[in-house]
Regions:
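Intrinsically disordered, low-complexity, charged/polar segments
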Residues: 40-78, 114-164, 188-245
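Extended, solvent-exposed polar beta/coil surface segments
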Residues: 1-68
Length: 245
């Protein structure tokens, strides 16, 4: 897959090769701190300074740490300051809950500055609300593809892959819908969405203009069998999660 091509709803396997580094602080307050082996310090940043250390959440069931993707070898509990260890991401199934593009790139205290933020949740975790004012948010773990960390991605599923945000379609039950994401369907009749659009679907317009014959054929072919509810079931089987609202 194009390693910068992400959409909400994508199911991915993400990994990062384990790389040698040094422990700066053993497990403290559910985190282990290591010298980060990939980013460079942006010494010209006017808004703050980074010491080159990253605190990784230790997966012990607390909300602060359950989103963490990175792991250490040996395990965090076996590490103390000064130890040499490896840090990386074993192949992990995640689903994408948010995608943000930054032009110009974000002003960060490390280099390279990220041009994209992708938020993911590990298999078994669903989006959830946290109390207002909490330092946590339930969308998941943020990564910045292309920021120097050698992530690799394998796309396992992209629901409604032939669709684009803003597409307008007609379904087999005679209802018209707007597609804004695999779980974001708006019926033009203003009636409750119910079980969602009834397949097969006919593409009516794309980007506010009449669709091309090729685009219409792709949408029709992708929805000739199956259903919206089957798509949800297939997605949930991969993610062990509920679709992001």
């Amino acid at each position: 897959m194009d390693e910068l091509d992400f959409r909400v709803g994508d199911v991915l396997s993400v990994a990062c090769p384990f790389t040698d580094t040094r422990v700066e602080q053993g497990v403290t307050w559910d985190h282990v701190s290591v010298r980060w082996p990939w980013w460079e310090i942006d010494s010209s940043n006017e808004f703050g300074q980074w010491n080159g250390i990253v605190a990784l959440g230790v997966d012990n069931g607390v909300p602060e740490a359950e989103f963490e993707l990175f792991r250490t070898d040996p395990l965090p509990e076996q590490l103390k300051a000064g130890d040499v260890c490896r840090v990386g991401v074993p192949p992990t199934v995640v689903h994408v809950t948010a995608v943000d593009h930054h032009d110009p790139p974000l002003e960060t205290v490390w280099l390279p500055h990220p041009a994209q933020t992708v938020t993911v949740l590990r298999r078994g975790l669903s989006y959830r609300e946290f109390p207002e004012g909490s330092h946590l948010h339930g969308s998941g773990y943020t990564i910045h593809p292309g920021d120097g960390i050698p992530f690799t991605f394998e796309r396992l599923m992209r629901p409604y892959a032939t669709f684009q945000a803003g597409d307008e379609v007609a379904d087999a039950a005679g209802r018209a819908w707007r597609f804004d994401g695999p779980w974001e369907w708006t019926a033009f009749d203003e009636e409750p969405a119910g079980a969602g659009p009834t397949w097969p679907l006919i593409l009516l317009s794309r980007a506010g203009a009449p669709c091309s014959a090729g685009d219409a054929e792709a949408v029709a072919a992708s929805t000739v069998s199956g259903s919206h509810q089957q798509t949800i079931r297939d997605w949930m089987a991969l993610t062990e999660a509920s679709p992001t609202p």
